[in-house]
Amino acid sequence: MKIIPILLIILTILEQGYCQDKRGQQWIIGSYRGAIVEFQDTSRPIVNPVYQTPPFYFTQGHSNICDSTTGRLLFSCNGMILYDSNGVIMDNGDSLVPPNAYNHSFFPNALYTQSSLILPKGSNGEFYVFICTITDLMYDYWYTNPLGDGRFPHDLLLYNIVDMNANGGLGKVVEKNKVLLQNVELHKIRMQACRHHNGRDWWLLKQGRYGTNEMYRFLVRPDTILGPFVQTLPSPAYSTFDLFGQMAFSPDGTKLAMVHCKMQELFFADFDRCSGELSNPKIVSIPTDSTGIPNAAPQYIMDSVIGGVCFSPNNNFVYVSKRYNIYQYEWNEPDSSLALYRVQHGPDTTYLPFQNYNSLHNGPDGRIYIGNTAGQFKQMSVIDHPDTKGAGAGFCRKCLRLDDTTAMAFTSPPGLPDFNLGAASGICWPLSQSESEVRSAEWVVYPNPSSTVFIVQNKQGKKKELYNVQGELLFSTKEDVIDVKHLAKGMYYLRVEHEVKKVIIE
């Protein structure tokens, strides 16, 4: 009778612990040289130019991670190279992508939005570093046979493992260029992660190939990575130029939003932290507005490119950045005519050519920071009160600043997941089961159907037997994760302690 109260106490403690996570407390930003943005409290963050050896390319595809307790910077990634906390290339941290992606002169791998992401690998000082890139074979083909309209698909998703216990805390790459997904065309942008319902594991999402609605997801655990699981959505099927665009989860982990640079729309859907699946998708039209530039040349009259997306800390609003305009969308407003508000119209500088608003990111101080496509200055504009509807959101022009003579420029915030999202309350059941089924069930198998693995919940240490439809025993195991990639498609029966469930391999 005391199990449920004790479980709730444990879950509460876990959630409180994760809510105090400081892994995103400092940011690395800047092109040509790097700077650390140090968030202290609710006052303006401090900017310190510390990385003095170019080229660093902390422009669009970069990421970093800090100590969960102190907020001290541990290491950073620019999409191609890992740097330790001193700005020196980490031991075995160079050449994390194939040679052509590394050396491409105009757009190396470091310049693609959300092309790298860092996640903790448990609590032992190890970390996963995920990078989306392109093989030399694919590069050579598309460079001589371009798709047109700036499209250049990637076909390789890699991960590396960093051990921060090595080299006196400066870290070392102990597993390098491990293949997670290959021989599949992928968008070169949009990769993000959200904590699993259990507060320990992560769901990693990566958008699939051009012209499809495929979303690849992986369950990232301390001991292994499961997947890929593939979900086909009703929309969007992006097939145009994809240098810019972003994917973002809401702070409570229940929503996902995406934008694509040449599509005048916002994709919005519910997200299930148990299954990693998206549901109830919808498309919100974003106006093709004027740039707001006085006496503009013809190519600068209309604003038709979207760069970034971000949720407000209270989950109620989605912010969308175009090159010259920033919009606030209230997703739960029943009157659609009142749901969209333009927070900013026109550039944040009188100097032209203005370098355009780009990706957005929540800061640890509750503000939203607005990146620049190819910044020429050491400033970044900020939304000071993103939880407030309309004009009260408070666009603050170039309020993140570095006023010294350092030769560098601010571009975009790093690609970070929400480390502050904790475990959710209740038991994590598959999305397909109704609440009544959940209450009566003693154990469950998910995902079902599956093409890779079945995960058995609430039967730890028990023998699991898999039978074909002829009743022949195929194998037995006590593991909770059952690998079925070697089996043919079709229906099977999973037996655990005299109870049988039907499972489908697809």
State the predicted function of each range.
Residues 3-10, 417, 462, 483:
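Terminal low-complexity, poorly structured segments
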Residues 20-433:
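Beta-propeller fold recognition
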Residues 437-446, 450-506:
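C-terminal outer-membrane/trafficking sorting elements
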